[in-house]
From Swiss-Prot:
Annotated Pfam families: Phospholip_A2_1
Family, per entry: Belongs to the phospholipase A2 family. Group I subfamily. D49 sub-subfamily.
Active site location: 48, 93
KW Metal-binding (keyword) present: yes
Keyword annotations of the record: Calcium, Disulfide bond, Hydrolase, Lipid degradation, Lipid metabolism, Metal-binding, Neurotoxin, Presynaptic neurotoxin, Secreted, Toxin
GO molecular function terms noted in the UniProt entry: calcium ion binding; calcium-dependent phospholipase A2 activity; phospholipid binding; toxin activity
Keyword Disulfide bond: yes
Taxonomic lineage of the native organism: Eukaryota, Metazoa, Chordata, Craniata, Vertebrata
A biological process term (GO) from this entry: lipid catabolic process
E.C. numbers: 3.1.1.4
Native source organism of the sequence: Notechis scutatus scutatus
Cofactor binding annotation: Binds 1 Ca(2+) ion.
The name this protein goes by in its record: Basic phospholipase A2 notechis II-5
Length: 119
């Protein structure tokens, strides 16, 4: 779910950047999304959005699904998840969290005018 996803982001980036910095970034980080991603981090958000869409097509509720995960030295991972929906959503979130951690953060792409830049 979205609360767990925020913890996974913090785990993957080892607390270097607060989760709120990802909530209004580029064209896809935050609610909704359209146009062409502005950079690598925004592409991570689009991939995560697409993964959640795929989960919904499978009958899952990704924004509300609670799953079991662990934050280790090397970052987050999903733990012993037997239910397919929960596993799918956890995998979406873990992959996105690692993608966020690897991608450069460009302050100029935070809180952009999406009407102009995300066509």
């Amino acid at each position: 779910n979205l609360v767990q996803f925020s913890y996974l982001i913090q785990c993957a980036n080892h607390g270097r950047r607060p989760t709120r910095h990802y909530m209004d970034y580029g064209c896809y980080c935050g609610w909704g999304g359209s146009g062409t991603p502005v950079d690598e981090l925004d592409r991570c958000c689009k991939i995560h959005d697409d993964c959640y869409s795929d989960a919904e097509k499978k009958g899952c509720s990704p924004k509300m699904s609670a799953y079991d995960y662990y934050c280790g030295e090397n970052g987050p991972y999903c733990r012993n998840i037997k239910k397919k929906c929960l596993r799918f959503v956890c995998d979406c979130d873990v992959e996105a969290a690692f993608c966020f951690a690897k991608a450069p953060y460009n302050n100029a792409n935070w809180n952009i005018d999406t009407k102009k830049r995300c066509q």
